[in-house]
């Protein structure tokens, strides 16, 4: 895994530990702010590969993208995620990819909490995985306090175009989420779910 490579990017602060533990934390903590800034630099470099403006060819482009992703995300280097630019993320190092991952363009990873993605997962264009949320109390919200809850996407999941996955959700193995759905609650394994909020409509029978 690339965890050792990105370890140096992870803030060594109490606020970071609060953040990934689902506790209220100060979003404008100095080290968290710097980590987001560093992430945006890497994100810009990755997104600038869109269109192969240097004419390096498909094979070299795939290699360069994998090298950039390895600087910020956690994954098995034998199977780098395939992500079409542009994409967006908060930190990057809180996203853990399984093998054979594919995301189409304009995907967003709001990773203030851990996003765990299994093997053979596919995301359509404009998918948003959002672990971040805010207090309902406006006084707490205005003070800069935020919190997040993890997202877990298990093996062999397909998430369709424009889906939004909200904090704390697990999508079970083999499930399919229809385009435009807003996933607010856990989805059982081998289930087709659609709508806003997403609701299971039938089981998927795998041969």
UniProtKB/Swiss-Prot annotation:
GO terms for molecular function: acetyltransferase activity; O-acyltransferase activity. The keyword Transmembrane helix does not apply. It comes from Schizosaccharomyces pombe (strain 972 / ATCC 24843). It comes from the Eukaryota. GO terms for cellular component: cytosol; nucleus. Keywords: Acyltransferase, Repeat, Transferase. Its EC number is 2.3.1.-. PROSITE patterns: HEXAPEP_TRANSFERASES. InterPro entries: Hexapep, Hexapep_transf_CS, Hexapeptide_acetyltransf, Mac_dom, Trimer_LpxA-like_sf. It is an enzyme of class 2 (transferase). Belongs to the transferase hexapeptide repeat family. This is Putative acetyltransferase C18B11.09c.
